[in-house]
């Protein structure tokens, strides 16, 4: 947006809010929320906790995924009438999996000034504490709820060399980590981060397989909001099925059923059964084929 072309209008401020700890908000953000003419909130009731905490009495209106297109037209009119508006989401930085995209583009269409304010973001907070490279990364949002769609996404990023960030909901975390193991491998390093900045915050880095074991042993850790950080593809670590594994499988396969041989071999080498099974099938190692 060329500053010379901006007419005398109001300003749309994009204001991040805390992702858990109410202290994680800047003085500048509070000052803006106190002095704008209107706050466009994703959920007014939810945002009142923060606004009351800082004695922010500014009028609020709702802007969410269901009303964004209609509400944006009203907000644009107010901005044109020199009203300053702050956009906030339930937590974190607006537009990161939250409403606001349509409104921002309407501001560009109507040459209205946009001012982004730095602040909290769950994805970045998890990334910087993940112990994984943060110089190059990609953000993929929420993993799909349906397994077929989720596996399709994981296959697409299987050879992505950058660090990968996903969000996930609590009731699907076991299924999603299992899919990560089966598609990206049991030794892919991931960082599991939940309840960031809150009392029960926990950050755990390990192989995907060990994270799954840890989760199953610590059921309460599945409660809360989750960020999954996945290490990028490294072809040095992709051959997880060693010659010793294949040799063991070959010997067992001559005496046992294919499925039984898979189960025992996986147990010996602490590999997920599904991962070893899929490897065997994809490399033409089956009930009626020898191992080459």
From Swiss-Prot:
Keyword list, A-Z: Cytoplasm, Methyltransferase, rRNA processing, S-adenosyl-L-methionine, Transferase
Entry keyword Oxidoreductase: no
Catalytic activity: cytidine(1402) in 16S rRNA + S-adenosyl-L-methionine = 2'-O-methylcytidine(1402) in 16S rRNA + S-adenosyl-L-homocysteine + H(+)
Protein's UniProt keywords contain Cell membrane: no
PROSITE patterns found in the cross-reference section: RSMI (PS01296)
EC number(s) given by UniProt: 2.1.1.198
SUPFAM superfamilies hit by this protein: Tetrapyrrole methylase
Location, primary (coarse class): cytoplasm
Coiled coil: none
Cellular compartments annotated: Cytoplasm
Classification via InterPro entries: 4pyrrol_Mease (IPR000878), 4pyrrol_Methylase_sf (IPR035996), 4pyrrole_Mease_sub1 (IPR014777), 4pyrrole_Mease_sub2 (IPR014776), rRNA_ssu_MeTfrase_I (IPR008189), RsmI_HTH (IPR053910), SAM_MeTrfase_RsmI_CS (IPR018063)
CDD domains (alphabetical): RsmI
Superkingdom of the source species: Bacteria
PANTHER family on file: RIBOSOMAL RNA SMALL SUBUNIT METHYLTRANSFERASE I
Role, per record: Catalyzes the 2'-O-methylation of the ribose of cytidine 1402 (C1402) in 16S rRNA.
Family membership: Belongs to the methyltransferase superfamily. RsmI family.
Protein name stated in the entry: Ribosomal RNA small subunit methyltransferase I
Species of origin: Buchnera aphidicola subsp. Baizongia pistaciae (strain Bp)
Gene: rsmI
């Amino acid at each position: 947006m060329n500053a010379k072309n901006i007419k005398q209008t109001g300003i749309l401020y994009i204001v991040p809010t805390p992702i858990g700890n109410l202290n994680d908000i800047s003085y500048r953000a509070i000052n803006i929320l106190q002095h704008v003419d209107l706050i466009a909130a994703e959920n007014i009731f939810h945002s009142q906790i923060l606004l009351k905490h800082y004695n922010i009495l500014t009028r609020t209106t709702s802007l969410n995924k269901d009303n964004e297109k209609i509400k944006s037209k009203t907000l644009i009119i107010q901005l044109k009438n020199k009203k300053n508006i702050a956009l906030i989401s339930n937590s974190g930085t607006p537009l990161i999996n939250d409403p606001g995209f349509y409104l921002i583009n309407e501001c560009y269409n109507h040459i209205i000034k946009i001012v982004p304010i730095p602040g909290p973001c769950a994805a970045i907070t998890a990334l910087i504490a993940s112990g994984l490279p943060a110089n190059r990364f990609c953000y993929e949002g929420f993993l799909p709820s349906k397994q077929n769609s989720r596996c399709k996404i994981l296959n697409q990023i299987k050879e992505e060399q950058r660090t990968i960030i996903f969000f996930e909901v609590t009731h699907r975390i076991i299924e999603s980590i299992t899919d990560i193991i089966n598609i990206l491998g049991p030794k892919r390093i991931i960082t599991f981060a939940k309840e960031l900045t809150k009392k029960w915050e926990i950050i755990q880095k390990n192989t995907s397989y060990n994270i799954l074991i840890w989760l199953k042993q610590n059921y309460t850790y599945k409660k809360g909001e989750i960020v999954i950080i996945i290490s990028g593809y490294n072809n040095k670590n992709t051959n997880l099925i060693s010659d010793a594994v294949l040799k063991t499988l070959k010997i067992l396969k001559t005496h046992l059923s294919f499925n039984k041989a898979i189960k025992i071999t996986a147990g010996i080498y602490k590999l997920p059964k599904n991962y070893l099974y899929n490897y065997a099938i994809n490399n033409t190692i089956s009930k009626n084929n020898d191992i080459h």
